[in-house]
């Protein structure tokens, strides 16, 4: 990689000094001045900064710079939303499959968080009319990123897709059809789970097709209006795990009589390595997962009115 010239390094140091003095207006001005020279400065964890060549796409300073279109009317049928935080080969596999196996009225929306290992570059390789790409300079928590994408788009149905979920055919249309079939259906997904009442809400169990208590975030389609009414995922959910189940119940609470369903039959998709679980720091993963589940219990435990109907009537 080319080394930045001395004058750019000097500007970056001035920016770091301005940030330390909390002169953020000056820091922003210096950041833009650096960008005009063809370089990008990024704050490093624990202090300091890195300087890299400016990529062939716009990079926003943070997810707060994404547009807020939450008050705008629906403009198309669905948007499939993907978070990109590394693993460029996974990005290519997942996004190419989405573009290949979804209809022309479906937009694929991806948020690149810091171009980790060139994942943002891999995303940009697939640019086109149906790919809406956002690039920000650094990382963001799971909920913050998901909420930014929800507010930025204007589809009738907003879809979470994990990078580990790879379409082998049109796995989206059955979910959209399930939502279209009944106004009470606010969400449909690939895999559903039910609260284990025998375990006093301390766990969930896999659910068969039909009405379910919660949908897992591997592939989770939701009415945008319902997702916005629920306030999006909880702002304290910094990690994905258990946040999908928490949000499922938030949808139910926000929309009286809401149904969440898994359509019958096997969807044409597969799950590759789930990086969020398998390649995250175990201590961080377990800590944040427990925080989210405890928050779920505090808010929803005992709310049997929010459960899907059981075959035994319970």
Regions found by a protein language model. Give the residues of each.
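Short, acidic, metal-binding catalytic loop of nucleotide-sugar glycosyltransferases
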Residues: 96-105
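Conserved donor NDP-sugar-binding/catalytic core segment of glycosyltransferases
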Residues: 166, 170-200
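Short aromatic/hydrophobic "clamp" motif used to bind/position activated sugar donors
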Residues: 158
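A recurrent flexible, glycine/aromatic-enriched loop bordering the glycosyltransferase active site
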Residues: 204-222, 240
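C-terminal, non-catalytic tails of nucleotide-sugar-dependent glycosyltransferases
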Residues: 63-75, 186-189, 194-202, 210, ...
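A conserved acidic beta->alpha catalytic loop
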Residues: 111-121
């Amino acid at each position: 990689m080319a080394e930045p010239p001395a004058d750019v390094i000097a500007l970056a140091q001035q920016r770091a000094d301005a940030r330390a003095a909390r002169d953020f207006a000056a820091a922003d001005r210096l950041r833009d001045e650096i960008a005009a020279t063809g370089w990008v400065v990024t704050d490093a964890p624990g202090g300091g900064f890195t300087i890299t060549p400016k990529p062939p796409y716009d990079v926003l300073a943070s997810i707060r710079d994404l547009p807020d279109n939450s008050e705008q009317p629906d403009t198309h049928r669905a948007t499939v939303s993907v978070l990109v935080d590394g693993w460029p080969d996974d990005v290519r596999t997942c996004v190419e499959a989405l573009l290949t196996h979804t209809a022309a009225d479906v937009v694929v929306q991806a948020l690149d968080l810091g171009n980790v290992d060139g994942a943002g570059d891999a995303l940009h390789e697939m640019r086109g009319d149906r790919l809406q790409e956002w690039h920000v300079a650094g990382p963001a928590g799971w909920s913050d990123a998901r909420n930014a994408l929800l507010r930025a788009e204007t589809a009738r149905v907003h879809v979470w897709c994990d990078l580990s979920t790879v379409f082998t055919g049109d796995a989206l249309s059955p979910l959209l059809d399930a939502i279209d079939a009944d106004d009470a259906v606010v969400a449909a997904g690939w895999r559903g789970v039910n609260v284990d009442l025998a375990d006093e809400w301390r766990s969930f169990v896999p659910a068969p097709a039909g009405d379910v208590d919660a949908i897992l975030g591997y592939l989770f389609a939701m009415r945008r209006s319902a997702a916005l009414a629920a306030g999006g995922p909880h702002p304290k959910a910094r990690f994905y795990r258990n946040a999908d189940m928490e949000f499922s119940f938030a949808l139910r609470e926000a929309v009286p009589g809401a149904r969440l369903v898994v359509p019958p039959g096997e969807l044409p998709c597969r799950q590759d390595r789930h990086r969020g679980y398998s390649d995250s720091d175990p201590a961080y993963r377990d800590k944040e997962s427990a925080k989210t589940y405890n928050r779920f219990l505090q808010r929803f435990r005992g709310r049997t009115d929010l459960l899907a109907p059981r075959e035994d009537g319970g």
